[in-house]
Amino acid sequence: MQATATTLDHEQEYTPINSRNKVLVASLIGTAIEFFDFYIYATAAVIVFPHIFFPQGDPTAATLQSLATFAIAFVARPIGSAVFGHFGDRVGRKATLVASLLTMGISTVVIGLLPGYATIGIFAPLLLALARFGQGLGLGGEWGGAALLATENAPPRKRALYGSFPQLGAPIGFFFANGTFLLLSWLLTDEQFMSWGWRVPFIFSAVLVIIGLYVRVSLHESPVFEKVAKAKKQVKIPLGTLLTKHVRVTVLGTFIMLATYTLFYIMTVYSMTFSTAAAPVGLGLPRNEVLWMLMMAVIGFGVMVPVAGLLADAFGHRKSMVIITTLIILFALFAFNPLLGSGNPILVFAFLLLGLSLMGLTFGPMGALLPELFPTEVRYTGASFSYNVASILGASVAPYIAAWLQTNYGLGAVGLYLAAMAGLTLIALLLTHETRHQSL
C-alpha cells in the first residue's frame, strides 16, 4: 500500500523551530564524512592495506582480501538502515542521527589506529573487517536521517533545495579525500606514507565528526516526527510495516536510485581504472592526471546538486527526475566511445565533466524525492532501506560489471549497461506520483 499524497495549502504557515543554517550544516556534514570515508578507504584498500593488514606471500591475494573488506560495508549498510531506521521512526530523528554519526566516526578513527599484520598477526585483518562493518552500519543510518533532517525542517516549496544539502556531501567528500591523498603524496616520501601517512585522513575525520555532533546535539527534534510522537502513532516494527504495507513504494524507491548509483561508480571507480590501465586494456593516462580531471569534474557535480534542487522545486520532483534520467540514457548511448574511448585527455575530461554534472542533477532531488514516498511513521526506515539496497544492486557491482563488459564486448557495452539501469529508473519514476505538493 502506498502512502497517499496530501496537497499542501499554499497559505500554510511555516514556523521553523530549528535554525536554517544548523539544519543545513547538520544534514551536510554526515554525508560529507560518509563519502570522505568511502574514498580514503577505497584508495587505501588498493595501495596500503594489502601491505599492512594481510600476509605478504601473494600480493594479488592480499589485494583481493583487502578489497573484500571494502565490500563488507555494502552488506552492512542495509542492516544499518534497518537498525537506525527502527530507532529513527520509533525514538526520533535527532538521537538516531547522533548515534549513526558516532558509529561511523568511531569506526573510521579505529581504522587509522589499528596495528598491522606484522604486529598482531591474524587479528589485524579481522579487526579491519570489524571496523569496516561498523562504518557500513553507521552509513546505513546516516543518509536517510540526514535527508529527513533537511526535508522535515524545510519551508514549503523548498524541500528539494533543502534536501540537496545532504547530497552535497558526495562531491565535497570526494574532493577533500582525493585532495588529502594528493597533499600527502607531495609532502611525504613513499616510505613515510606507507609507514604512518595513510593513517592521517582516517584520524582527521574525527574533527569532522566532532563538528557534526556539536551541531546535531544542539538541534530540536523534527516537527514532523514530534506530531507523530504526540499522537502516539509510531509503529512497533517499522521494517515489518514497511515490507508488509509499503512494498510497492519500497521497490520503486530502490529502482529510482539505481541510475544514480550506477552512474556515480562508473564515472569514478571504473573511469579511473580504465583511464589509468595500460593499453590495450585501458588508456594508459597518468594516475595523477586522471585524479586531477576527476577533482575538477566533481566541481561540476557539486554545482549541479543545488541547481537540481531549485529546478525540482520549480517544476516538480518527479518531472525533473524523468527529464534528467532521459538525459543520462542519451549520455550512456552516445558519449562513451567518442569521448572516453578517444584517449584524448581533453575529451576524457569532457566525458567526466558531463557525466558528473548529470550525476549532480540526478542526485540533488533524491534528498527530497525518496523521503516523500513514505509516510512519517516509516519514513526513516523506508528512505534508508531503499537507498542502501540500491547501493548493493547499483554501486557494489557496477565497476566490476563495467570492466567485464568492456573486456569482452567493448566500451559501448558499458554505455548500454548504464542506459539499461537508467531505463529501470525511468520506469520506476513513471510508476510513482508527483511529490512536490505532498505534505510530510
Residue ranges and their predicted role:
Residues 90-102, 314-326:
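Cytoplasmic membrane-interface "Motif A"-like loop-to-helix N-cap segments
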Residues 212-219, 421-440:
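Multi-pass alpha-helical transporter architecture, strongest
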Residues 161-185, 387-398:
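Glycine-rich segments within core transmembrane alpha-helices of 12-TM secondary carriers
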